[in-house]
Each structure stands twice: as C-alpha cells, then as structure tokens.
Amino acid sequence: MSLSIGLLSYRSHPYSGGQGIYVKHLSRALVQLGHKVDIISGPPYPELSQGVNLIKIPSLNIFEEEDRLRSFKKSYFISPLDLFEWLSVMSGGFPEPYTFGVRVREYLKKSLSNYDIIHDNQSLCYSLLDLQKEIPLVTTIHHPITRDHKLELESTNNWKQ
C-alpha cells in the first residue's frame, strides 16, 4: 500500500545539525518503498533526492543573521507572529518550533487531504496536536531542542548575536 506522507521539519540545514540530513535520507528511503513524500520545511531548506517534493514554509530565519538586532524590518509590525519571533530571539528565546507550527498549520488546513499521514520530525509544536483528530500523526524526537538553544547561546560572542 502506497502512502502520501507529509514529513515536517521546522529547520532542515542540508549539511549540519542533523534534521536536513535525516529528512533527506528518510524521504529517499520512503520514496524507494513506493510512497509519495512531501518535505514541509522552514529555512534553511534541505537538499532532497529526486522524487521528493519540497514545500517551503517561510520564516524569518533569524538564526542565520550575522547581526540579529539589525535584522528587524518594519514589516514585522504587520505580522504579530513575525514580531513575536523576532522579539523572542532577541530576548534569548527559541521560537522556531512554535512559529513553524503556526505557519505549517495554516498550510495543512488547506492541504491536509493530500496526505495519509503526517510525520513530525522534532518540531513538537502545539498547533499540531489537534491534527490527530483528522489524520494519523507520528512524531520523532531526536533529543531535547533546549540543548541546541543552550549551545547556540554559549557560542555567541556578545549579546547582539
């Protein structure tokens, strides 16, 4: 039986961090087994094998900015979610799982019927919990994301970063 799988990853760097590499190899194996796979990811986006579709969920991607303080744009005032994401990062928070969850839920409201199952790869966002009422939801937890956040904070040279 062939399945249509939505594989979620809030951040999928293609060369480091693990999530982008994990979803690349998992999606390739699932396609080889005959399944249809969409990677639904926030930036940075993964490099994927042939036959795997990428659905890009935009975000501010502030963690990639050299000067996060100066990355602010007036347009953030238009979107409460963008403003929350920027303010949270600037105060030492790690909002990406939450903000990805809100954004991906909006995408899935329109596209849920395209999938037989959703596989959440580490995003652990609250907004996905109600999906279980409508579609099977599987979650993979690799390790606590608080470890990533702690390492990020420890590696900064000054408060601007």
Residue locations for each model-derived region?
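A conserved catalytic-core segment of Leloir-type glycosyltransferases
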Residues: 2, 40-103, 108
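Nucleotide-sugar donor phosphate/pyrophosphate-binding loop at the beta->alpha transition
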Residues: 96-103, 147-161
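Short catalytic/ligand-binding loop motif for oxyanion handling, primarily in non-cytosolic enzymes
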Residues: 16, 46-49, 64, 125-130, ...
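Short, hinge-like loop/turn segments at secondary-structure boundaries
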Residues: 53-58, 136-137, 155-158
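Short, basic, glycine/proline-bearing loop/turn elements
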Residues: 12-13, 90-93, 147
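Short N-terminal targeting/anchoring amphipathic segment
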Residues: 92-96, 107-126
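Active-site proximal beta-strand in glycosyltransferases
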Residues: 5, 117-119, 131-151
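N-terminal subdomain of nucleotide-sugar transferases
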Residues: 1-61, 111-113
